[in-house]
Amino acid sequence: MKRAVGYGLLFSTVLMTSVVVHLPAQVALSPLPLPEGLELTGIEGTLWQGQAAQVRWQGMSLGDLNWDLHLSALLLGQLEADIRFGRGSSTQLRGKGVVGVGLSGPYADDFLLSLPAAQAITWLPLPVPLMAQGQLEMAVKQYRFGEPYCQQAEGSLAWSAAQLESPIGALQLGTVVSDFTCQESVVTLKGGQKTAQVSSEFNLSLQPDNRYQAQAWFKPEAEFPESLKEQLSWLPQPDGQGRYPFNQQGQL
């Protein structure tokens, strides 16, 4: 009798697993209430391994989405998947990596985001007209959610082939590299760059209550554009090493 019950439980488990694995993604996702502003169209594949031809968030096209759920994570009470998105995105934002939801909330590991700098700068409230060239890449080694920003996170942000253009001239920045960390929603970002035109370093911090502090300096190098040199007279005097410092703090 016990053996029959055991076989029955085993058969039921295998059957349920097979149903879940082969359940069409369209059938599984259609009844679910998606967050307001999120739209998924062209859903294909299974709940386990599928894709959406188009993802839209608040009216913005994010391109396609592919996912591959991890069975091992489900056994630990977590919903985890490898995802890739961005092909066909109107903003050219692309991303890939591991995302999941556990008992402690959302998380991500080894996640990479890529976006043209020309697109990113349009989202910033700049006091003067600027254009940017190059590619932004954010590599998130690990992220653990915690109100309001993150319980823990670390990674890097790189801006390759960086260039800023203004009505009075362009500045070649080369590669701007920075590292970021987060502990208890205290976010810090530190980095710098150097080219034949200019060198700089910066250090930013953001508190959970949205207070921020920024410290930075830049130094004109030998090939600093002549059209921009004229504007240096409007700045405070540089220090003994020829660096122009900036310090700012406030509330976002």
Swiss-Prot record:
Coiled coil segments of this chain: none
Transmembrane intervals: 5-25
Segments on the Cytoplasmic face: 1-4
InterPro entries assigned: T2SS_GspN_CS, T2SS_protein-GspN
Pfam families recorded: T2SSN
Role according to the record: Involved in a type II secretion system (T2SS, formerly general secretion pathway, GSP) for the export of proteins. Required for secretion of cholera toxin through the outer membrane.
Entry similarity comment: Belongs to the GSP N family.
UniProt name for this protein: Type II secretion system protein N
